[in-house]
Amino acid sequence: GDDSSHWNFDPVGGDNKSTVDDFGFVDALLDNLSSNYQINRDRVYAAGFSNGAAFAFGLACYQSENIAAIVSVSGSMSPTQQEGCNPQHPTPVMSIHGTQDSYFLYQGGYYLSMDAVTNYWTSYNQTQTTQPTETVSYDGLIIEKFSHTQGNNSSKVDHYKINGGYHIWFDIDFNGQSTEDLIWDFVSGFDKNGAL
C-alpha cells in the first residue's frame, strides 16, 4: 500500500492506493454525526482538492444517497469512476481547474479531461441550457465560467477554467467572490431533492 495521506476514490478493490474503505468511513462518520448532532442529512456536501476532489466525485458516483452536491478543485474522475458511476439522484457539480495542472491534466491523460468530466455530469443531470461564458481577469489569470443549468431537479454543472492555473487550491476573486464563497454559494443552493 501507499503510506502517504490519501483518499481511496473507488470502492474497496478498485483503482485505489490502499485497501482502506474511505466510503465506509464517510458513511459511519455521517451516521455518528446525525446520531449525536442535529444535522440535515439532505444537505451534506463534498468538496476536495486534488485526490480529495477525485474522492468527492467518488462520493457522487458511489454514495450519492449521502451527498447533495460536490465541488472539485484541481481534481478529476478516473476511468473506473466514469465506468462505475451510479448516482441515485441528479447531482450538482462545480469544478475549478487550471489549464497548466501537471497532475490532473486539463486535457486529460489517465484521468478524464475537464471537458469529459463536464460532459459526463451535464449528460447525467440532463442540463438544458448553457449560459453565456463569464470571463474575469484576476492576478494575471483569465478565469472563464461555464454554467450548464436547468437540469433534472434544477441541478446544474458549473466549471471555472483557470487559464494558466497550476495544480493548486486557487485563491481567486471572481466578481467579488473568493473561491470559498463561490463553493458555498453553489452547494448551499441544493439539497438531495434539488434546488432550494
Q: Could you describe each region identified by the protein language model?
A:
Residues S35-T91:
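Primarily recognizes the serine-hydrolase "nucleophile elbow" in alpha/beta-hydrolase
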Residues N86-S102:
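A structural motif
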Residues V93-I96, Y111, T122-L196:
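C-terminal catalytic histidine-bearing segment of alpha/beta-hydrolase fold enzymes
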Residues D22-L29, N51-L59, Q63-N66, S113-Y120, ...:
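Stable alpha-helical elements in mature extracytoplasmic
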Residues D101-F104, H167-W169:
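Acidic catalytic loop of the alpha/beta-hydrolase fold
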Residues G1-Y45, F57-G58, Y62, G84, ...:
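Serine-hydrolase catalytic machinery in alpha/beta-hydrolase-like enzymes
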Residues S102-S113:
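Conserved alpha/beta-hydrolase "acid-adjacent" motif
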Residues D31-Q38, A60-A68, T122-Q126, S188-K192:
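Sec-exported extracytoplasmic/periplasmic mature domains
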